[in-house]
Each structure stands twice: as structure tokens, then as C-alpha cells.
A protein has these predicted regions:
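Ser/Thr/Gly-rich flexible loops in soluble cytosolic domains mediating phosphotransfer, phosphorylation
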Residues: 43, 100-134
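Short beta->alpha junction loops
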Residues: 59-68, 120-122
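A generic structural motif
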Residues: 53-58
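N-terminal, charge-rich interaction modules
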Residues: 4-31
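Mid-chain, well-packed structural core segment of small domains
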Residues: 71-107
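Ser/Thr/Pro-rich, acidic low-complexity intrinsically disordered regulatory segments
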Residues: 2-11, 36-40, 132-134
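Glycine- and acidic-residue-enriched helix-capping/strand-helix junction motifs
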Residues: 29-43
Length: 134
């Protein structure tokens, strides 16, 4: 017999989200004159705050252009189990970062094979990308 009263609900566990992105100070902003490292960092902080307010257990992990990116990603994935891994557009869409993107996909595949992958076009649509896979 349950000790819960009729109509009581059990909260679903929070979806754990790892948001991988290029460290803002490493982004090439030449194609984005209205953006800067400071503005991008603020957008990312705001996005993580909004994701947490929306009920996600979200963590942002910034990576470099390849020197330690795989190790940093592997360490983040070892720290806790993630349900969804979002790889940001800055890592995914810049042609010079293609091999880094491939490396990160493979690290996620190896270290978190059950995690769903999703992709955004900017920090502003990260929640929609996560919801597609959560």
C-alpha cells in the first residue's frame, strides 16, 4: 500500500545535460562583429541558468581548440552520467574545427554511449535542441 495520497505525483528525475562549447575567448568573432568573448560568455551563463530554471541539471563545459578538449570532455563525462550532450554550434560549424568536432563526437560515443546528442545554432536555441532529445 502506498503512503502517497491520491493525486500526489512523484517528480521525474531531472534530465542531466552536458553543454559542450568552445571557450568564448577562443572563438573567432570576425564573422560576428556584434559579438565578443564577454557577450558570448554572458549568453552561455544565462542559457545555463535558464536551463536549470526549466528543470534541467545543466552543466556547461568549455573546451579549447584541441590540445585538451578530448580529455576535458572525457573528465566531464566521467564526473556524472549525462542523459543529453549538446555540442554547440561554435564547435560544429566552423570548418577549421571539423576534426575537433569529430573527436568530441567519438569521446561522447565512447564515454556516454546512452546519452542522446543534440545540436544548437546559437546559445539562444539550446533549450529547444535539448527538448528534442530529452
Amino acid at each position: 500500500m502506498s503512503s502517497r495520497a491520491a493525486g500526489d505525483t512523484v517528480a521525474a528525475p531531472m534530465t542531466a545535460v552536458l553543454y559542450l562549447g568552445l571557450e568564448p575567448h577562443l572563438v573567432d568573432f570576425s564573422g560576428f562583429p556584434d559579438l565578443s568573448a564577454e557577450k558570448l560568455a554572458a549568453q552561455l551563463r544565462e542559457q545555463v541558468t535558464q536551463l536549470r530554471a526549466a528543470g534541467f541539471d545543466a552543466d556547461f563545459v568549455g573546451v579549447d581548440r584541441g590540445e585538451t578538449a578530448a580529455a576535458v570532455t572525457a573528465a566531464a563525462l566521467a564526473a556524472k552520467p549525462y542523459d543529453v550532450v549538446l555540442i554547440g554550434a561554435g564547435l560544429r560549424t566552423a570548418p577549421p574545427l571539423l576534426t575537433l568536432f569529430e573527436t568530441l563526437i567519438n569521446v561522447v560515443h565512447e564515454r556516454a554511449p546512452r546519452a542522446r546528442l543534440c545540436f544548437n545554432t546559437s546559445p539562444r536555441d539550446s533549450e529547444a535542441a535539448i527538448r528534442r532529445q530529452a
